[in-house]
């Protein structure tokens, strides 16, 4: 592990993610996180005051990482892309980058429901901020797509910001009953395609 404080902090958060996924929030202790990280419990406390702060910091870390990946997808600048993507493909990929990491925790961890509840109670402000930031990015993408003639917002009688909100909320609702990531991806891609077809 690097001696950089930032790298140590991220290593602790990654270890916390593993422990929370394995045992849930309530059963995980600071000692568990320290052991998973490979450092002393005292070292953990030099970065975080308590488990609650670890949890909030982890939530912020995961949201920031998801938003960063979503931004790359919206721009279509992934290294694997060999040709420009249509706006529907970029938006669908960005939505999946934003919502799928959290959906995977819910569906793949035995403690997914508990973690989702804790996140809602302890990190609601972080969730709202992340949603607003993503919708702002999506609004910019839709505005650019309209300017470039890829979509026509006037056809749908929507402003870019309203369309962005509907797309995000609609895609988020598709998590309901999606038992795995493949199901969610299929739903999101179909939803975005149908939604944007109404703007052509």
Where are the model-predicted features located?
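Helix-turn-helix
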Residues: 11, 15, 19, 23-53, ...
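N-terminal intrinsically disordered/low-complexity leader segments
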Residues: 1-7, 77
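Hydrophobic/aromatic-rich alpha-helical bundle segments in the mid-to-C-terminal region
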Residues: 109-113, 117, 124, 128, ...
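Hydrophobic alpha-helical connector segments
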Residues: 57, 71-104, 164
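Generic hydrophobic, amphipathic alpha-helix propensity
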Residues: 8-16, 33, 58-62, 66-70, ...
